[in-house]
């Protein structure tokens, strides 16, 4: 872990919301721009717990490798942090925004202090991935010859389709509505 005393030295600071009067006029992000210096500081608050509950069944439902990408953000190794994030999360650019951040509720630091700003860090990592073109199509090296049908194109259906495609299967996604996305669209 990067800064072993970061949790003692720094208080939690999250990105503030944009003013409501601005937000009602557009569909842009509700938070202000990320402050990269603050993000590194916030990532340094991760304590390298013996048992990181943030990424266990008590915390993140997709088992994100939270302490690992916190450390990489602290070290300013953003692309590696992005690679860790997408190992466990098919859509971090979406889940980082809609997730209720149970990982923060499970953060051990939260027992005595405010928890690490995990949700903000996840959003910042995925935003950097979008800005720098790190999201890439990754077709499988070999096809299995098997075909799979996925019913429903919401986050779960699209995640399943992506994982099955990585495994080499030919995947067809079926959706009853006029466009894909499920709850992300309607």
Describe these PLM feature segments.
Residues 1-147:
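Ferredoxin-type iron-sulfur electron-transfer modules and their immediate structural context
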Residues 90, 154-156, 179:
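Residue-level detector of alpha-helix initiation sites
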Residues 121, 153, 176-177:
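Fold-independent oxyanion-binding glycine-rich loops
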Residues 122, 162-163, 184-186:
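Short acidic, glycine/serine/threonine-rich loops at helix termini
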Residues 147-173:
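N-terminal Rossmann-like FAD-binding beta1-loop-alpha1 element of flavoenzymes
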Residues 169-185:
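Glycine-rich FAD pyrophosphate-binding loop
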């Amino acid at each position: 872990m990067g800064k072993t005393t970061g949790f003692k030295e720094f208080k939690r600071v999250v990105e503030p919301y944009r003013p409501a009067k601005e937000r009602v006029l557009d569909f842009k992000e509700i938070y202000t721009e990320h402050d990269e210096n603050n993000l590194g500081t916030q990532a340094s608050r991760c304590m390298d717990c013996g048992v990181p509950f943030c990424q266990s069944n008590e915390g993140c439902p997709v088992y994100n490798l939270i302490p690992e990408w916190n450390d990489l953000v602290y070290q300013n190794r953003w692309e590696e942090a992005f690679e860790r994030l997408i190992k466990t999360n098919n859509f971090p650019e979406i889940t980082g925004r809609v997730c209720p951040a149970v990982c923060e509720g499970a953060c051990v630091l939260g027992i005595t202090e405010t928890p690490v700003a995990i949700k903000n860090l996840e959003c910042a990592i995925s935003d950097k991935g979008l800005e720098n073109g790190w999201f890439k199509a990754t077709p499988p090296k070999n096809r299995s010859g098997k075909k799979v049908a996925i019913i429903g194109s919401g986050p779960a259906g699209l995640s399943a389709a992506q994982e099955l495609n990585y495994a080499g299967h030919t995947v067809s996604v079926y959706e009853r509505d006029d466009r894909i996305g499920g709850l992300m669209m309607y």
